[in-house]
Amino acid sequence: MARVCEICGKGKQNGHSVSHSNIKTKRSFNANLQNVKIEVNGSVKKALVCTKCIKGNKISKAK
């Protein structure tokens, strides 16, 4: 299972680490994903969801 948000599809992005002497090395920026129990069609399932979707009320948390 890939580290991708199941709601919006947000995943890993690539970029550079830049040192003081301006040397650039490749690095990756991971999305802030959390395991959350969500309610889908009346049933409860676990899903990897980014914090932006959690805070934006794009999911309904299971109680």
From Swiss-Prot:
A GO term for molecular function: structural constituent of ribosome
Organism whose genome encodes this protein: Brachyspira hyodysenteriae (strain ATCC 49526 / WA1)
GO CC field: ribonucleoprotein complex; ribosome
Protein name, as recorded: Large ribosomal subunit protein bL28
Gene Ontology biological process terms in this record: translation
Keyword flag Secreted: no
Family to which this protein belongs: Belongs to the bacterial ribosomal protein bL28 family.
Pfam families: Ribosomal_L28
Keywords, alphabetical: Ribonucleoprotein, Ribosomal protein
Gene3D superfamilies tied to this protein: Ribosomal protein L28/L24
Keyword Glycoprotein in annotation: no
UniProt-listed NCBIfam families: L28
InterPro entries, per the entry: Bacterial_rp_bL28 (IPR050096), Ribosomal_bL28 (IPR026569), Ribosomal_bL28/bL31-like_sf (IPR034704), Ribosomal_bL28_bact-type (IPR001383), Ribosomal_bL28_sf (IPR037147)
